[in-house]
UniProtKB/Swiss-Prot annotation:
Enzyme Commission designation: 3.6.4.-
Region described as Head domain (RuvB-H): 252-343
List of residues binding Mg(2+): T63
Single GO biological process annotation from the record: DNA repair
Written domain comment of the UniProt record: Has 3 domains, the large (RuvB-L) and small ATPase (RuvB-S) domains and the C-terminal head (RuvB-H) domain. The head domain binds DNA, while the ATPase domains jointly bind ATP, ADP or are empty depending on the state of the subunit in the translocation cycle. During a single DNA translocation step the structure of each domain remains the same, but their relative positions change.
Name of the protein in its database record: Holliday junction branch migration complex subunit RuvB
Species this protein is from: Pseudothermotoga lettingae (strain ATCC BAA-301 / DSM 14385 / NBRC 107922 / TMO) (Thermotoga lettingae)
Cellular localisation: Cytoplasm
Similarity annotation: Belongs to the RuvB family.
Segments of this protein annotated with the region Small ATPAse domain (RuvB-S): 179-249
CDD domains linked: AAA
GO molecular function, one term: four-way junction DNA binding
Record note on quaternary structure: Homohexamer. Forms an RuvA(8)-RuvB(12)-Holliday junction (HJ) complex. HJ DNA is sandwiched between 2 RuvA tetramers; dsDNA enters through RuvA and exits via RuvB. An RuvB hexamer assembles on each DNA strand where it exits the tetramer. Each RuvB hexamer is contacted by two RuvA subunits (via domain III) on 2 adjacent RuvB subunits; this complex drives branch migration. In the full resolvosome a probable DNA-RuvA(4)-RuvB(12)-RuvC(2) complex forms which resolves the HJ.
One GO CC annotation: cytoplasm
Length: 343
């Protein structure tokens, strides 16, 4: 397992660093503005907040925002995930226990069983669920009334949501990668909470290698803290960060060994591409979902690869970063290839 895939490692500490309010939440300014207006209006009307869908790559704060919403609205939050909702009875049991105005947070909502998803339609619109009892000719439908609630869904692949489910969300908010400056603020806030002293330059080094992702920034901070502890250093300084990054094999762009392996495979085995995602994943012995959800978004955002109708292509930036001679000068090569594939 590479560093970026360690989504659950040390999550207890990460949870303790979560902000409780929108004011304390750093970054995602446009999303925060929309949430502030929606929550304030719902409070003034004394009604539940509209259903919300958060989408974006892992680690950008979708779960944290769900907790912030519950805290700001003064309501309880009920947490589950799409893959565990296998039967209609599963969702009926959760929905029937919800109090008025509560928040139901469903992570990986795109992975909900389709039969369960259909139960949601009436629950989200009319606050009622119809459950089938029994099988065959003796089967009958029971309607259960629900207290008004707010569904907050989180997905890394919003395109996999069916239109009927997607259309029942009143707000669909796309989370963006964070800037280095925003990540520095998050790192310094975490250091203050954990009583760690850190140099400005050290915070910048960590932030610049965190792939625009708070979760990764905080994990990197923890690893740097480990190195500082072993070396009996009382303050996190730049050389400690650089030493830690060398140990973790994380380069200046924030790429780990698997990221570089993806790019090397594209360049060495597929001559830079294009190559289909299935073939690339099979060559790497990597799950397609891991490639598409964990690694590809950042590689795309950094301009290291592009997607074309014929598959993924390594860009001139990727060749340069890994020290390969470019087949053709970066920008011209990338643009001409993109146009030829789109024509």
């Amino acid at each position: 397992m590479n560093f970026v895939q360690q989504n659950r490692e040390g999550d207890a500490i990460l949870v303790s660093l979560r902000p409780d309010t929108l004011e304390d939440y750093i970054g995602q300014e446009e999303v925060k503005k929309k949430l502030y207006i929606a929550m304030k209006a719902a409070k003034l009307r004394n009604e539940p907040l509209d259903h919300i869908l958060f989408s974006g790559p892992p680690g950008l704060g979708k779960t944290t925002l769900a907790f912030v919403i519950a805290k700001e609205m003064g309501k309880n939050i009920h947490i589950t995930s799409g893959p565990v909702l296998e039967r209609q009875g599963d969702i009926a049991a959760i929905l029937s226990s919800i109090e008025e105005g509560d928040i139901l947070f469903i992570d990986e909502i795109h992975r909900i069983n389709k039969a369960v998803e259909e139960v949601f339609y009436s629950a989200l619109e009319d606050y009622k669920v119809d459950i089938m009892i029994g099988k065959g000719p003796t089967a009958r439908s029971i309607r259960i009334g629900l207290k008004p609630f707010t569904l907050v869904g989180a997905t890394t692949r919003s395109g996999l949501l069916s239109s009927p489910l997607r259309n029942r969300f009143g707000m669909i908010l796309e989370l963006q990668f964070y800037t280095v400056k925003e990540l520095m603020e998050i790192i310094k806030r975490a250091c203050k909470i954990m009583n760690i002293e850190i140099e400005e330059s050290a915070a910048q080094l960590i932030a610049s290698r965190a792939r625009g992702t708070p979760r990764i920034a905080l994990r990197l901070l923890k690893r740097v803290r480990d190195v500082a502890t072993i070396r009996k250093e009382n303050k996190i300084i730049s050389h400690l960060v650089e030493k830690t990054m060398d140990i973790l094999e994380i380069d200046k762009l924030g790429l780990d060994e698997m990221d570089r392996k993806i790019l090397r495979t594209l360049i060495e085995i597929y001559d830079g591409g294009p190559v289909g995602i299935e073939a690339l994943a099979a060559t790497l012995n990597l799950e397609i979902d891991t490639l598409k959800e964990i690694h590809e978004p950042y590689l795309l955002q950094q301009g290291l690869i592009i997607r074309t109708p014929r598959g993924r292509v390594a860009t001139g930036i990727a060749y340069e970063h890994l020290g390969y001679p470019s087949k053709i000068s970066g920008g011209l090569f990338d643009e001409s290839l993109r146009k030829s594939d789109e024509s």
